Amino acid sequence: MDATLAFPLLVGLIAVALFFDFLNGLHDAANSIATIVSTRVLRPQYAVFWAAFFNFIAFLFFGLHVAETLGTGIIDPGIVTPQVIFAALMGAITWNIVTWVFGIPSSSSHALIGGLVGAGLAKTGFSSIVWQGLLKTAGAIVMSPGIGFVLALLLVLIVSWLFVRQTPFAVDSTFRVLQFVSASLYSLGHGGNDAQKTMGIIAVLLFSQGYLGSEFYVPFWVVITCQAAIALGTLFGGWRIVHTMGSKITKLNPMQGFCAETGGAITLFAATWLGIPVSTTHTITGAIIGVGAARRVSAVRWGLAGNIVVAWVITMPAAALISALCYFAADLVA
């Protein structure tokens, strides 16, 4: 392919992608620290530094399978143009900002995938969609909250049985320490899965402009800059969403926080190794609901959980609609 986009414009579009990655950290990093903050194991200002560090080093632990899926497995890379990438990013960024302002824990992953699909449909219609990859991703998006729910619920039941003879103080003290481990694992999972989505976007843009040759791959500088952007976003993560995730859905103690984070982390690790982009937001939401339901069903604020599900359902079509409109606008200007 010929490199048809002026270099300054290419740099500008990459900057937009990195801004999305920063917003992803800002918006979704709350998921990494919500439970450890709500259980008062760490203060918010210390928790964000903790999460940012593990978000940044996540590339050391995972392959780049999620980036490859985003780059080649959602829409046909052959139809990708700068307008498609711009529209996809603007759809995702716009929706992320709207939900962040209102403190709604919607998914940056859903928004980006919806943005890609909307831009692809606007350009060439249904032929632009890689249906096998999209359906696999959509299936994982639907299943991941349920998997997080089940794993966290099982962990609570197992841990409660193992520590049944311990005093509440001893259990609390033990899991205050163990929550550092579980929060670290969840932050690794978040950085490993979410940063790779932006890597895939930047890499397919470079590929479409001929900068990668005939083979799609993710350059190392893209890996580092994306991990840095999501880590910086984590440092500025929003307390609005931390409060919703960590205390409004259900009250948590350190043992429950450990189980929620561990259940969510296992889900994210498996998805990342399989190359499936999933929602870190809804994975931890499912896990938090699971630990609340293990205590008693009424411990979960089901009304708020229902609002989160509504946001989960409308995110992809909303981002797709915004991105399609942005594509048509960008195409007119071009």
UniProtKB/Swiss-Prot annotation:
GO molecular function, one term: phosphate transmembrane transporter activity
Family the entry assigns: Belongs to the inorganic phosphate transporter (PiT) (TC 2.A.20) family. Pit subfamily.
InterPro entries hit by this protein: Phos_transporter (IPR001204)
Cellular compartments per GO CC: plasma membrane
Organism: Rhizobium meliloti (strain 1021) (Ensifer meliloti)
Record keywords, A-Z: Cell membrane, Membrane, Phosphate transport, Symport, Transmembrane, Transmembrane helix, Transport
The keyword Membrane is annotated on this UniProt entry: yes
GO annotation, biological process: phosphate ion transmembrane transport
Membrane topology label: Multi-pass membrane protein
Membrane-spanning intervals of the chain: 3-23, 47-67, 84-104, 111-131, 139-159, 216-236, 258-278, 308-328
The keyword Cell membrane is annotated on this UniProt entry: yes
The reaction(s) this protein catalyses: phosphate(in) + H(+)(in) = phosphate(out) + H(+)(out)
Protein name (record): Probable low-affinity inorganic phosphate transporter
Annotated localization: Cell membrane
Primary site of residence: membrane
Pfam families tied to this protein: PHO4
Function comment: Low-affinity inorganic phosphate transporter.
